[in-house]
């Protein structure tokens, strides 16, 4: 897919990347990446968190059913904010930055991507 996308010159958002191959191809496209609950345990997602350039990571849940699937437990709606904060902290840990820096980088990525 990355090879096909490269021919279009578009800004790409790679949603919930979880493959143990091809990450370099998506990095070469200067893609944005979403991080979901897989950041806690999935080695491929953790590698994205480590290697994506600054300002190219977005944090999301993909909905509560996806969060429940990834975490293997019920996730009530009122836990959504805490889950997003925990994912930001985990990404910060993997990147060797403070949670505040990670939060600012994710916010900057959102604003750059969506023109906010």
Please tell me what each predicted stretch does.
Residues 81-116:
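Mid-to-C-terminal alpha-helical segments outside catalytic/metal-binding sites
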Residues 55-77:
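Short acidic/histidine-rich active-site segments
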Residues 43, 75-82:
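Residues at secondary-structure transition points
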Residues 1-58:
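Catalytic pocket-lining loop regions of alpha/beta-barrel enzymes
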């Amino acid at each position: 897919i990355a090879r096909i996308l490269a021919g279009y010159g578009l800004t790409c958002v790679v949603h919930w990347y979880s493959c143990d191959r091809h990450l370099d191809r998506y990095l070469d496209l200067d893609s944005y990446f979403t991080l979901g609950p897989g950041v806690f345990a999935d080695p491929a997602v953790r590698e994205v968190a480590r290697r994506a350039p600054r300002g190219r990571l977005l944090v999301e849940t993909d909905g509560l059913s996806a969060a429940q699937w990834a975490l293997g437990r019920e996730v009530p709606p009122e836990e959504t904010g805490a889950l997003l904060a925990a994912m930001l902290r985990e990404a910060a840990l993997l990147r060797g930055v403070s949670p505040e820096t990670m939060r600012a980088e994710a916010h900057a990525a959102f604003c750059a991507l969506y023109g906010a």
